Curated annotation (Swiss-Prot):
Homodimer. This is tRNA pseudouridine synthase A. InterPro entries: PsdUridine_synth_cat_dom_sf, PsdUridine_synth_TruA, PsdUridine_synth_TruA_a/b_dom, PsdUridine_synth_TruA_C, TruA/RsuA/RluB/E/F_N. One of its GO terms (biological process) is tRNA pseudouridine synthesis. It comes from Ehrlichia ruminantium (strain Gardel). The active site is at D52. It comes from the Bacteria. Formation of pseudouridine at positions 38, 39 and 40 in the anticodon stem and loop of transfer RNAs.
């Protein structure tokens, strides 16, 4: 029986989604151990997105297989019982066909990046948003968005260690909402390059600081060179919001 689960987590104290060794503090391995504790079955949990260390999730999707046909509420409650000491929660469980794959069946992934633009330190949003002290010109950031949306070669916006075969991606939506001092950047695509969202955010922030005009984003894009783009925004401001499968 294949189970599809939706997971929420605070990524602050984890090395990221993907397990790296048998004793790693990864979300994937912690989930696998929790499932084993209630089912006595060794499973592999496949996630829709391999979030980095510090990245949070509101709606990460994953799947795994069990030989036992449990009621979905039992699966949810049992996993959460064994996650009680971790900042991870299973918020939804459903049974699905065996041809469903959390990663490869995904049609669109949605991310949110949170910025707080003020001089005072963060309290409630500490490790949950990027604190930018310099006043940002949000209007210029919004103007820059049009140069990023659409189908492009995103070589300037990928990490050097990115293993994706092609740098060409399609950003379906990129929008910025501003309610001083909070800036939310929402972005969606079928898939992303390694650090693509965080480099886009870092570049938009540099535009907002006045380092370059909005139209300079086009030059950065055409350069196909990581050194032309801005800094990689901190991981703790990034949230994996949800996944579409239709």
């Amino acid at each position: 029986m294949r189970y599809k689960i939706v997971i929420e987590y605070d990524g602050s104290n984890f090395i990221g989604w993907q397990k790296q060794n048998h004793n790693s503090n990864s979300i994937q391995e912690i989930l696998e151990k929790a499932i084993f504790k209630f089912s006595k079955q060794h499973v592999t949990v496949y996630g829709a997105g391999r979030t980095d260390a510090g990245v949070h999730a509101l709606g990460q999707v994953a799947h795994f297989d069990l030989t036992t046909d449990f009621e979905t509420y039992i699966v949810r409650n049992a996993i959460n019982y064994h996650l009680i000491s971790h900042a991870i929660a299973v918020v939804h469980v459903e049974k699905t066909d065996t041809d469903f794959h959390a990663r490869f069946s995904a049609k669109r992934r949605y991310y949110l990046y949170k910025i707080v633009n003020r001089y005072s330190p963060l309290t409630i949003d500490r490790n949950r948003a990027w604190l930018v002290h310099t006043p940002l010109n949000v209007e210029n950031m919004i103007k820059a968005v049009c140069y990023i949306k659409g189908n492009h070669n995103f070589s300037s916006f990928r990490a050097k260690c990115c293993q994706s075969k092609s740098p060409v991606k399609t950003v379906d939506n990129l929008s910025i909402t501003y309610n001083h001092p909070y800036i939310d950047i929402n972005i969606s695509a079928i898939s992303f390059l390694h650090h693509q969202v965080r480099i886009i955010v870092g570049t938009l922030v540099e535009c907002g600081k006045g380092y370059f005009p909005p139209e300079h984003i086009k030059t950065i894009m055409e350069a196909n060179n990581r050194s032309y783009a801005g800094t990689t925004a901190p991981s703790y401001g990034l949230y994996f919001v949800k996944v579409d499968y239709s």
